[in-house]
């Protein structure tokens, strides 16, 4: 049974339970298989690029919308050594529809819907909602986490500047 972290995050002040470990900078990034927009299995790890993994509960909510659009804008300024991946428990079809409707084309969207494998491995699976909580992980080319943020209040935005700074530093290393 996966570890449960009661009260690890809140939604509008109400405590929620996260399933899985709390990962920190320096930890090895677990691999997890997610679905892409074509329903193909896709690994969260990338051997040749630094990855900013932006985790959102659902693209169809206001803060998740803002977060994903913000990272799409930032992706154009990061260069070829860094890629941004958005993970949510939305169906892959919903992710494709949302990206198309919002002109989001520089972020890779991957779905954790099938097994919540990513959520369980990265400690972002919200037990009460079967969604992933808001978080950001930066993973270097060697598969090490160099930045991790679990946003305490799901309705708040993450620290974009800290994640982007960590990604740029990892790409320059």
Regions found by a protein language model. Give the residues of each.
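Chalcogenol-based redox active-site neighborhoods
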Residues: 1-173
């Amino acid at each position: 049974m996966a570890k449960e972290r009661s009260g690890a995050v809140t939604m509008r002040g109400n405590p929620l339970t996260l399933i899985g470990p709390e990962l920190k900078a320096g930890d090895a990034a677990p691999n997890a298989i997610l679905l892409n927009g074509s329903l193909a299995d896709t690994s969260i790890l990338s051997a040749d690029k630094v990855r900013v993994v932006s985790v959102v509960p659902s693209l169809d909510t206001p803060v998740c919308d803002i977060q994903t659009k913000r990272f799409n804008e930032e992706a154009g300024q990061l260069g070829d050594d860094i890629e941004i991946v958005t993970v949510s428990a939305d169906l892959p079809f919903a992710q494709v529809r949302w990206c198309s409707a919002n002109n989001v084309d520089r972020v890779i969207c991957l779905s954790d819907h099938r097994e919540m494998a990513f959520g369980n491995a990265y400690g972002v699976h919200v037990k009460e909602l079967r969604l992933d909580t808001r978080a950001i992980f930066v993973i270097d080319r060697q598969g090490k986490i160099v930045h991790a943020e679990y946003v305490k209040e799901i309705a708040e935005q993450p620290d974009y500047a800290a994640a982007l700074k960590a990604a740029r530093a990892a790409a320059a290393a």
